A protein has these predicted regions:
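Low-complexity, repeat-rich tail regions
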Residues: 177-515
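Cleavable N-terminal signal peptides
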Residues: 9-10, 20
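Flexible, surface-exposed loop/linker segments and immediately adjacent secondary-structure boundaries
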Residues: 20-160, 165-176, 200-202, 208-210, ...
Length: 515
């Protein structure tokens, strides 16, 4: 009997571990800026698709910044900025830290908060480990060009590099250059390129954010809140953020569209530049006719949710789908696979204790008339919902259909009552940068149509040279360096859709010095 009991305990432990493994990621990044065109390679199918702002980024994803473009990814309190014709792969991303890979192109990394597990950047010739918050430059060379030396630079902060020929510690103003054959590690002085200066300006704007006083530094997407709203104290909920650039009649979860994003399923993608944190963390409430966002307790670790709403409606497979933004102390019931621990962590910042969360989680879902924000119910037809159409253009009049006996519309408590995922869960894939799969033979993807409906791209940045300005530092070098001379600036082919517009502008963009 003891043996049987031991086996039962073991099986229970395995089952519990399996339930925990089924939980979706609690920590994500977001595509926060696209100047031009970008693509995302999803972890679940490894296909490249057009990328728009506010799309969540998880471990296993890749991001490609197209020709003539610049792209930014926010990861908690840090940002990775990609120059044109550059790729960044996310190998690890969770509460403990991040591991990134740069197969090709130029990436500027701003680290404001270093997680306990640290942050590493993998390259073709070694590992770049971030030791302190700061700004870092990674240049892996341009796709399709001749082999170049890899440049890793510490603009500010502290890092280390470990490669085939040894390891070296780097301080502010230092970098390493490593040839493709990895025969040496050369320590050099580094200075900001024009791309770094653009990234530094962008980082400076976000660094001045007062929102860090009210939200956790691990909350992805808080950086734009100060630019588009104000924080005000309230007697019942503490600091509340109010958006300042919304139209009359605006309500949360109306300006954007729904996308089927694994592993969560239906995910809200907002149109606003600030529209990430307020729609994936916290709760909304109306204050004298103004909508305000309540972030929750700052000391609680934020857990990402695809949309903090309650879906409401009639029978499964109906013609319409409705939802209501959750208000203060209203429970979010995940409509995707999850464990009990996940539900507690997801709602912890808005309830007094775990027991209260458990009681709400196991209670029957309320009718639509029980929600504090029931006046802000939004409804669209099922086709517009599952087709990713702009919600504000397809809203249907009237609220969700009532339940049996003319009772308030019921809450859709399981995914089976939501519209099924579209047969084709992704947009037409953009040609993928083959260099990621075939090192040494990279080919940039061709320009593709712009992604998110209703999102016009920002003006493309003017091409500018970014030959790294480097000087040897004999006192710290591992091997006697060869003189570093800037390479000639080759003419680079412009994207077809921009040739006429930019034919009078500077023809060359960022290019790596060659040896």
């Amino acid at each position: 009997m003891k043996k049987i009991a031991s086996l039962l305990v073991a099986f229970s432990a395995i089952a519990a571990a399996g339930a925990a493994l089924a939980d979706p990621p609690a920590f994500v990044g977001r595509l926060s800026l696209v100047e031009g065109a970008a693509s995302i390679r999803h972890a679940y199918d490894q296909q490249w698709v057009p990328g728009g702002i506010n799309f969540p980024i998880i471990a296993g994803d890749g991001v490609w910044s197209d020709q003539g473009s610049r792209t930014e990814i926010e990861i908690g309190g840090s940002e990775a900025r990609l120059d044109q014709i550059s790729e960044l792969d996310i190998e690890r991303l969770d509460e403990s830290g991040a591991t990134l890979r740069v197969p090709q192109g130029v990436v500027n990394l701003t680290v404001r908060y270093l997680p306990p597990g640290g942050m590493q950047v993998m390259t073709s010739v070694g590992q770049f480990s971030i030791r302190r918050p700061g700004e870092y430059h990674i240049d892996a060379g341009r796709p399709g060009g001749p082999p170049t030396q890899l440049l890793l630079g510490v603009m500010s902060g502290e890092a280390s590099f470990a490669g085939l020929r040894g390891a070296v510690e780097l301080n502010s103003g230092q970098g390493v250059m490593v040839p493709p054959d990895q025969t040496s590690i050369q320590v050099v002085a580094v200075y900001p390129t024009p791309f770094d200066q653009w990234a530094e300006t962008r980082a400076g704007q976000l660094a001045a954010s007062q929102s860090m006083a009210y939200v956790s530094p691990e909350m992805t997407g808080y950086q734009d809140l100060d630019t588009y709203g104000q924080w005000q104290p309230t007697p019942d909920y503490g600091p509340v953020w109010f958006p300042s650039q919304v139209e009359i009649g605006w309500a949360p979860y109306r300006r954007g569209h729904w996308a089927y994003v694994q592993p969560w399923g239906w995910t809200w993608i907002d149109d606003a530049p600030w529209g990430f944190a307020p729609f994936h963390y916290g709760r909304w409430a109306e204050f004298d006719g103004r909508w305000g966002w309540i972030p929750g307790e700052r000391h609680e670790r934020p857990v990402y949710a695809p949309a903090l709403v309650a879906f409401i409606g009639g029978e499964p497979g109906g013609d319409h789908v409705g939802w209501v933004p959750l208000g203060p102390r209203e429970m979010f019931h995940p409509y995707y696979e999850h464990s009990d621990v996940y539900v507690i962590n997801l709602n912890r910042g808005h309830f007094h204790d775990e027991g209260e969360i458990r009681r709400f989680d196991h209670a029957p879902p309320p009718g639509s008339d029980h929600f504090a924000n029931r006046q802000a119910v939004t409804q669209v037809n099922a086709g517009a919902f599952s087709g990713g159409q702009p919600v504000h253009e397809h809203m249907t009049p009237g609220g969700p259909a009532p339940g049996p006996g003319n009772r308030p519309a019921p809450v859709i408590g399981d995914v089976g009552r939501l519209p099924p995922p579209p047969a084709q869960q992704r947009a037409q894939p953009a040609p993928s940068p083959a260099g990621a799969a075939q090192p040494g033979q990279p080919q940039p993807p061709q320009p593709h149509p712009q992604p998110t409906p209703g999102q016009a791209p920002a003006q493309l940045p003017r091409p500018m040279p970014t030959v790294p300005q480097v000087q040897p530092l004999p006192q710290t070098q591992i091997q006697q360096p060869r003189p570093v001379q800037p390479a000639p600036q080759p003419q680079q082919q412009q994207a077809p859709q921009q040739q006429k517009k930019e034919q009078k502008e500077t023809p060359d963009h960022d290019h790596q010095a060659q040896h």
